């Protein structure tokens, strides 16, 4: 029996609000790239990245050339992308 493989991606993020572009890129890849392409995706936060989920932090994070982190988190929630801390 051939079982079709479902592409899966785990993204590990460790950058926090001090580096807004690096902090936002994992969420951008997950929401606008992988999940939008049908790839089962999850995000794992470690180190400084864990601060991004604190109340009010995401609202102040705006990377260069990508959407604001708050919008990316909203899109991740809509796509039901799990975020593990």
Language-model regions, residue ranges each:
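Short, glycine-rich nucleotide/cofactor-binding loops
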Residues: 9-24, 56-58
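N-terminal beta-loop-helix "entrance" segment that forms/cooperates
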Residues: 49-63
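Acidic, glycine/proline-rich low-complexity segments that act as flexible tails and inter-domain linkers
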Residues: 2-3, 35
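Acidic, glycine-rich active-site loops and adjacent beta-strand->loop/helix elements
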Residues: 15-17, 47-51
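A glycine-rich helix N-cap at a beta->alpha junction
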Residues: 59-85
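Short internal beta-strands
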Residues: 41-46, 83-85
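Glycine-centered short loops/turns at secondary-structure junctions
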Residues: 37-38, 80
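Histidine-anchored nucleotide/phosphate-binding helix
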Residues: 23-36, 43
């Amino acid at each position: 029996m051939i079982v079709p493989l479902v592409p899966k991606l785990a993204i590990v993020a460790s950058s926090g609000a001090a580096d807004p572009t690096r902090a936002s890129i994992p969420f951008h890849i997950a929401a606008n790239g992988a999940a939008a392409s049908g790839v089962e995706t999850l995000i794992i936060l470690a180190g400084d990245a864990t601060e991004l989920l604190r109340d009010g932090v995401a609202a102040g994070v705006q990377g260069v050339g990508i959407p604001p982190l708050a919008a990316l988190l909203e899109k991740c929630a809509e796509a039901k992308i799990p975020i593990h801390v």
